[in-house]
From Swiss-Prot:
Activated by phosphorylation. Catalyzes the conversion of glucosamine-6-phosphate to glucosamine-1-phosphate. Its EC number is 5.4.2.10. NCBIfam families: glmM, PRK10887.1. This is Phosphoglucosamine mutase. Keywords: Isomerase, Magnesium, Metal-binding, Phosphoprotein. It comes from Listeria monocytogenes serovar 1/2a (strain ATCC BAA-679 / EGD-e).
């Protein structure tokens, strides 16, 4: 990735790193690159999550788009996958989502989608970066009727909800579903969707105020929903992240059902229905060893990619696969949408429950997980973790002790100044000990001095 774009668009602290000035330039440069071959007044959709900085960045971004002659349709607050779907459904030339997903409220981000609803290629992002770095802005500056326009398309939310309902064959009558919307983009979507599907609903994290997105709620804090599920005696819980492209489930006894287990459950069901393309699922290197052992027992093939849903989607498109995702809850059903979609994944999961008549705890128990621990360490330069000799040495030592019965993954985050240390081993005690041993060296060698 380059100077501006990470694995999921441009991100930074809003108003200091991701400034209105940068948003304006991203609108101009990004809009130009994505629409220059379209003709006069190409259409671009713009949406945001619930962060307090969203409207500021939206205004600046739209000004940039309009300045190169683009017709902007504002969707307001809607999930990232909602934007991806509507891009194709509305015949737009491109779309832009303003969100930092699961990151804290101080952060924000800008990510583009092409006319096909997919995230941009590396080449497209590189071209935008080159324009951003050009000293003089020589892009067109139309005037009069050559300028773009701005209109609102808030009814797009309902069109997206109606589409989601068409992807399953069952309603959810008789199910009590607990929803955690992370005080984010699904707050105005999830309850309407599940009510339309005749479910009994209890919701939390659905009162955004601009400052509380992901704050102790959502897919990065599933323990909050676990307690809520038990309190409300719900059959299942679904926790989304700030922009709605992830989901983590909770079963009826309060156990967390992560992305690996959701993918496993859905892969098994799709295979039984003859709907799993090429009998293959795509995952990342972060998926649990138990996930792969479970797939092997079912004789389902797997393809592994680097961490990041964009890499999962690339592999799915290249291999004509229709199911893939990440342990973190990004799950892609490529028959139905072009990116991870928390609402879509949630209804697919509950559809399996309804079709099989099984509780979520029963379905999840069919995949056994290895104990796993993940440490996130804030560092001064995350990209040097792979060539630090002391870090490499402790990893080699731990892997030798494991003797093949576990694994270690140490990598820089694609979206934050963090090094992620992930360890799986035969027992929880070994997992904790190995993870702390490696993390201690990473902290000693690389951690920021607070």
């Amino acid at each position: 990735m380059g100077k501006y774009f990470g694995t999921d668009g441009v991100r930074g602290v809003a108003n200091s790193e991701l400034t209105p000035e940068l948003a304006f330039r991203l609108g101009r440069m990004g809009g130009y690159v994505l629409t220059r071959h379209v003709g006069e007044h190409p259409r671009v959709l713009v949406a945001r999550d619930t962060r307090i900085s969203g409207e500021m960045l939206e205004s600046a971004l739209i000004a940039g788009l309009v300045s190169v002659g683009i017709e902007v349709m504002r969707l307001g607050v809607i999930s990232t996958p909602g934007v991806a779907y509507l891009t194709k459904a509305q015949g737009a030339s491109a779309s832009v989502m303003i969100s930092a997903s699961h990151n804290p409220v101080d952060d924000n981000g800008i990510k583009f989608f092409g006319s096909d609803g997919f995230k941009l290629s590396d080449d497209q992002e590189e071209e935008i970066e080159q324009l951003l770095d050009t000293a003089e802005d020589t892009l067109p500056r139309p005037s009069g009727e050559g300028l773009g326009t701005v209109s609102d398309y808030f009814e797009g939310k309902q069109k997206y909800i109606q589409y989601l309902k068409q992807t399953i064959e069952n309603d959810f009558n008789g199910y009590h579903i607990a929803l955690d919307c992370a005080n984010g983009a699904t707050s105005g979507l999830a309850t309407h969707l599940f009510a339309d599907l005749d479910a009994d609903i209890s919701s939390m994290g659905a009162s955004p105020n601009g400052l509380n997105i992901n704050d102790g709620v959502g897919s990065t804090h599933p323990e909050a929903l676990a307690a809520f599920v038990l309190d409300k005696k719900a059959d299942v819980g679904l926790a989304f992240d700030g922009d709605g492209d992830r989901v983590i489930a909770i079963d009826e006894i309060g156990q967390i059902v992560d992305g690996d287990k959701i993918m496993f459950i859905c892969a098994k069901y799709l295979r039984e229905q003859g709907l799993l393309n090429n009998n293959t699922i795509v995952s990342t290197v972060m998926s649990n060893l138990g996930f792969y052992k479970g797939l092997k027992e079912l004789e389902i093939e797997d393809v592994q990619t680097a961490v990041g849903d964009r890499y999962v989607v690339e592999a799915m498109r290249e291999g004509n696969y229709n199911l893939g995702g990440e342990q973190s809850g990004h799950i892609i059903f490529l028959d139905h949408n072009t990116t991870g979609d928390g609402l879509l994944s949630g209804i697919q999961l509950i559809n399996v429950m309804k079709a099989t008549g099984k509780k979520l705890s029963e379905l999840a128990a069919e995949m056994k997980t290895f104990p796993q621990k993940l440490e996130n360490i804030r560092v001064s330069d995350k990209n040097h973790v792979t060539d630090n000799p002391k870090v490499s040495k402790v990893i080699d030592e731990v892997e030798a002790e494991m003797a093949g019965n576990g694994r270690v993954l140490v990598r820089p985050s694609g979206t934050e100044p963090l090094v992620r240390v992930m360890v799986e081993a035969a027992t929880k005690e070994e997992t904790d000990e190995y993870c702390e041993r490696i993390s201690a060296v990473v902290r000693s060698e690389m951690a920021l001095n607070d």
